[in-house]
């Protein structure tokens, strides 16, 4: 027999249950969108840059971080539905860092049924011996890893080496090179290695780091933190990462626009004489519909204050039409 209290509490319980059900449906919907977006972006990058071809053996470099786990997971999904046939072998370089949990990756890869190879090389001792305390280890560590991975690729018969750099890594590299190297240089989605023998691909070129974080949480990857360099909070790359995250939060769309700019480069509007023949440029006296203009049609829109926090408060926009009449 229902008591009066139970009868009164029933509507509240039903409301809570309905709210929980709605929240679960929304979460499932968002995860489905995330999955589709990740697979679409990786598939698009592979297509745009012809990263993987029929019969390729792709060596997926797996560090144990969210990015490489995500890359492997997405590539395995695409492998099942791709119109071409390619194989995957996951490779981890065990650098003998103290406390590195050697059992995690083999257990995960066996459970997924993925072919894998663990390469044991004590690069940790070399880096610690050569690099002074407090100095950045990334450069030497990267060179050592690269040489080892190239050798392993040969031994395994891999035709492609896949690295887990994402969209934010691309942007961060551009700013690092500008701020500290005086170069306008990013991170190519596909390249031939410096020894001329290997093709390196970055299938996550279009993927945002925040999406990889959400995917890693959803898939419950057994993340292995990098104790060698990941705790060096003063790294220039970490500072750049914080800058980009701040921009993304304060100015939605800015990061996407900057990333798209990499595929819309106009060499004639830069200053590299190796890319454009400024020295030999002379007027021909003949109008060219495809020719260059000093001012683009939408320059006025780019310069005009928009009223947003991103606009320059004291700048005044001058219509392009007026400038052309001067």
From Swiss-Prot:
Record's GO cellular component terms: cytoplasm
Keywords, alphabetical: 4Fe-4S, ATP-binding, Cytoplasm, Iron, Iron-sulfur, Magnesium, Metal-binding, Nucleotide-binding, RNA-binding, Transferase, tRNA processing, tRNA-binding
Source organism of this protein record: Leptothrix cholodnii (strain ATCC 51168 / LMG 8142 / SP-6) (Leptothrix discophora (strain SP-6))
Pathway: tRNA modification
Enzyme class (EC, first level): transferase
Localization terms from the record: Cytoplasm
Name used for this protein in its record: tRNA-cytidine(32) 2-sulfurtransferase
Role according to the record: Catalyzes the ATP-dependent 2-thiolation of cytidine in position 32 of tRNA, to form 2-thiocytidine (s(2)C32). The sulfur atoms are provided by the cysteine/cysteine desulfurase (IscS) system.
């Amino acid at each position: 027999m229902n008591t009066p209290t139970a009868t009164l509490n029933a509507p509240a319980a039903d409301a809570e249950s309905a709210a929980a059900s709605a929240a679960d449906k929304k979460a499932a919907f968002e995860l489905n969108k995330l999955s589709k977006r990740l697979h679409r972006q990786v598939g698009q990058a592979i297509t745009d840059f012809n990263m993987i071809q029929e019969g390729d053996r792709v060596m997926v470099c797996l560090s144990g971080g969210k990015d490489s786990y995500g890359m492997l997971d997405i590539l395995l999904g695409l492998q099942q539905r791709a119109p071409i046939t390619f194989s995957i072998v996951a490779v981890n370089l065990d650098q003998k860092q103290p406390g590195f949990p050697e059992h995690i990756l083999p257990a995960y890869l066996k459970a997924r049924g993925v072919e894998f190879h663990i390469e044991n090389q004590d690069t940790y001792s070399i880096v610690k011996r050569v690099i002074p305390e407090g100095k950045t280890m990334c450069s030497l560590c990267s060179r050592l890893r690269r040489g080892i991975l190239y050798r392993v690729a040969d031994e395994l018969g891999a035709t492609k080496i896949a690295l887990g750099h994402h969209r934010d890594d691309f942007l961060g590299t551009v700013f690092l090179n500008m701020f500290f190297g005086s170069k306008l240089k990013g991170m190519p989605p596909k390249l031939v290695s410096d020894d001329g023998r290997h093709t390196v691909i970055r299938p996550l070129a279009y993927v945002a780091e925040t999406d990889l974080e959400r995917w890693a949480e959803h898939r419950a990857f057994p993340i292995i933190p990098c104790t060698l360099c990941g705790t060096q909070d003063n790294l220039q790359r970490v500072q750049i990462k914080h800058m980009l995250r701040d921009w993304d939060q304060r100015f939605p769309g800015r990061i996407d626009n900057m990333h798209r700019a990499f595929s819309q480069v106009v060499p004639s509007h830069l200053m590299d004489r190796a890319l454009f023949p400024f020295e030999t440029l002379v007027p021909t006296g003949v109008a060219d519909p495809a020719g260059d203009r000093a001012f683009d049609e939408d320059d006025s829109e780019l310069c005009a204050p928009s009223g947003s926090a991103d606009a320059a408060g004291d700048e005044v926009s001058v219509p392009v039409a007026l400038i052309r009449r001067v």
